[in-house]
Amino acid sequence: MTSSMKRISILLAFAVALLLTACAQKQKENQSVETKTLVAYFSATGTTAEAAQKVAAVTGGDLHEIQPAEPYTEADLNWRDEQSRSSVEMADKSSRPAVKNTVENIDKYDTIYVGFPIWWGIAPTIVNTFLEQYKLDGKTLVPFFTSGGSDKGETLKYLQPSAPNGNWKEPMNLNGMSQDDVKICVESLK
């Protein structure tokens, strides 16, 4: 093999290596774009979990269930009993029930959908506990809720102080919505 052929072979091998490196880098960039949305939710009965799964499917976001350190029992959720755990927690707006789990590397998310059922006209205080665990400055925070008949009530009034420097959107009522309807709601935010 002549010396010019060797040079050409070396240059071609170098060009192929550069091309493969560029393709691998582009693939990494595309993967990181896909993981910029988090769908965090608290669901006592499963209704909000269903809505969260639809939001995650539409957005391509990662799902995170906000789990109470002490799971709620049926008796805890009895809103007719003023002494039930949920009634006591919701009567004290400063109540912060402990959360069992956390989100690793929350910094990688630009947009966080936060789902919950409406309890007493607002989000359950465990959602405040979740928000207060992290520095969410500059992140887009999109509350969504489910309810047996209530509207958003004063949800934002009580959630915003838990992440005061977040870019809050209006809460979305996703109760009983199909995935197509959820997609319309999510796309209306853009």
Stretch-by-stretch model annotation:
Residues M1-I10:
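Bacterial N-terminal signal peptides that target proteins for export
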Residues L19-A22:
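C-terminal motif of bacterial Sec signal peptides marking the signal peptidase cleavage site
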Residues E104-D107, L136, S150, E154:
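Surface-exposed, polar/charged faces of alpha-helical domains
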Residues I106, E132-G138, S162-A163:
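Short, conserved loop/helix-junction motifs that constitute active-site signature segments
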Residues F116-P117:
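Glycine-rich, N-terminal phosphate-binding loop of Rossmann-like dinucleotide-binding domains
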Residues V142-S178:
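Short, glycine-/small-residue-rich phosphate/pyrophosphate-handling segment
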